[in-house]
Amino acid sequence: MKESFKGLCNLNEDELKALLENSKTSIVIDTEVLLMLFQMEEKNSSELLDILESEWMSDKLWMPYDVGFSFMCNVNSYIVRERQLINNARKQLENFHDNVINMKSNPYLKDDVLANFKDTFDKIKTSFDSDINALDLELEKNTKKERIDKIFSQDKVGVNYTDAQLSELFRRGGERYGKKMPPGMDNGNTNERERYRDYIIWKEMQGFASYYKRN
């Protein structure tokens, strides 16, 4: 039964190892994974980029054109949005800090507890400031984006569809979305390329796997 429904069954450890070691296996990284690099702690994002840069992984990586297209269109706004989220959290923390400090005359707020609170506040605030500075630096220096660009060199990126091909994909995507057939979900985006992005990427992956006989 498992042979008939491979797509619905998890691979065991040996099967997964065999798949990863197969020279015909390609690994596709989605746009969201690339964007998350700008949300992670610097240590974690650097480690993930190190893995993607490793010779073993690099040989297997391939990027559908629309993954790269979506990443390039959204990465700067994503960084700005992350910066704003951190800044908002920082302001809320400062407001909470001020409210607590104003209660210092409360007899139940002991000096040692207040001191611990101030210490914790300073550590969290420093962490927020560090994250904001890292995002500002990324917008200025493009360090991570340059590493991603080198990882996905031109030969590892798919070819853009023609306007005629895109029109046909939009039509088919609309039919599937109307029937609630995955991949993808109708998010109401008026930009058809974004609206049918998951479907377009799926079709490009199918074409790549079929043409190059890849897993």
Outline where the language-model segments fall.
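Active-site-proximal, substrate-binding regions of enzyme catalytic domains
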Residues: 2-214
